């Protein structure tokens, strides 16, 4: 009996593998928090018997069956933890330059892939599905066209106009602040006017600059001159996965092919390294975790800022875990520094009290999942909007990166740690965030395999995705109505003038006859 069950189990495994799809995932992106979102899905798909080929900068430490990696981490132009404070100031002050940098970085990713002989070897391979990231350009969309395979895109941020627009999903600037803005949901007239300007600017920049002539020229050099325009391929995207959830973001109208998977990267906490475990276990007053993400080098901040953090932390009864690049830096006795910390596992520890963060989307969602209140120091991109939304919910306070004094840091940390309402509201938000019919990972897996089964999901797409921009905005209808109204007014005016003229002419004739 046991032998028959073993044979049946082996047969099931073989059948699931033989029916597995060939999937290509394109994630050369150099921010590990961005890749973590895709990684959770890709590893699960591989475990379910699909053959997953992934271009990545973060290869697995241990081989995963059915997951075949093309490691581009050593490529020129890719660098993790590379943003220094001086460059950070430029990014903060110039949103337009920030967006152009996103576009240039996306093209760099494509150049790295297109110049890699291992990627060239799979260019003509037949894939059943292609998965890519929404960032600054879709110069890699040609892989889906080459295989005649459906395309799924993943956005590791809250909803952006350029991501929603490709799916035919409404993105209304009247109540949807653009991702870089600091506007509230309820905007006044001037904020709505500025928001509309930014909204149109980003749409133009993404589709006509990010996916414009230069991107097409580069892609056609790799895929062939018969490749369609990038935007044409992008508007055929089958699904968009968005790493957010309506409980932490304002509710949006979403079409069926835009699916929220907020928190897909959050895992069950694993045992911590012994030193960190001991440090946290023995923290009588709890632990504060401080990191500004994988992109920014905290050690390059001005000396007075670093000193302000040291002095503030020294006065706290809590212990502090600080992600800091220079591990030889002299620190207070209650501070443990490392170049890297297992963030997800730290959040799962019972003694964690607060999270000092830049407000990056992935880390913020981990904090929400585990119910850890936030002291936010937003730097760029979506981080201000993320932190401001948490401040509005009463689960975070905001610190200005250009005003990081000892007193400000101490005041913010003490407020969040000592005022229990922050922790209580974050735990309530965590319950809302977790309360779903399916886990975000199960949701993503289901819809990915749905697209594979049906060879695309174009039946989920609204007709809005195929309208010209002036049709989508009803500018042609509005123009017609205005012209018709003006013509009607002109005709009425002409008739009235004619009638008046006729009346006065008749009156004059009558008077002349009487005289």
Curated annotation (Swiss-Prot):
Predominant location: endoplasmic reticulum
GO MF annotation: an example: UDP-glucosyltransferase activity
Residues in compartment: Cytoplasmic: 493-515
Reaction(s) the record says it catalyses: kermesate + UDP-alpha-D-glucose = carminate + UDP + 2 H(+); flavokermesate + UDP-alpha-D-glucose = flavokermesate 7-C-beta-D-glucoside + UDP + 2 H(+)
Keywords from the named record: Endoplasmic reticulum, Glycoprotein, Glycosyltransferase, Membrane, Signal, Transferase, Transmembrane, Transmembrane helix
PTM notes: Glycosylated.
Glycosylation sites: 51, 236, 303
EC number: 2.4.1.-
A Pfam family it matches: UDPGT
Biological processes, Gene Ontology terms: organic acid biosynthetic process
Subcellular location: Endoplasmic reticulum membrane
Topological domain spans for side Lumenal: 21-471
Membrane topology reported for the UniProt record: Single-pass type I membrane protein
Residues making up the signal peptide according to the UniProt record: 1-20
Highest taxon listed in the record's lineage: Eukaryota
Protein family according to the UniProt entry: Belongs to the UDP-glycosyltransferase family.
PANTHER family in the record: EG:EG0003.4 PROTEIN-RELATED, FI06409P-RELATED
Biological role: Membrane-bound UDP-glucosyltransferase (UGT) which catalyzes the C-glucosylation of kermesate and flavokermesate to produce carminate and flavokermesate 7-C-beta-D-glucoside (dcll) respectively. Carminate is used as a deterrent against insect predators.
Protein name, per record: UDP-glucosyltransferase 2
Gene: UTG2
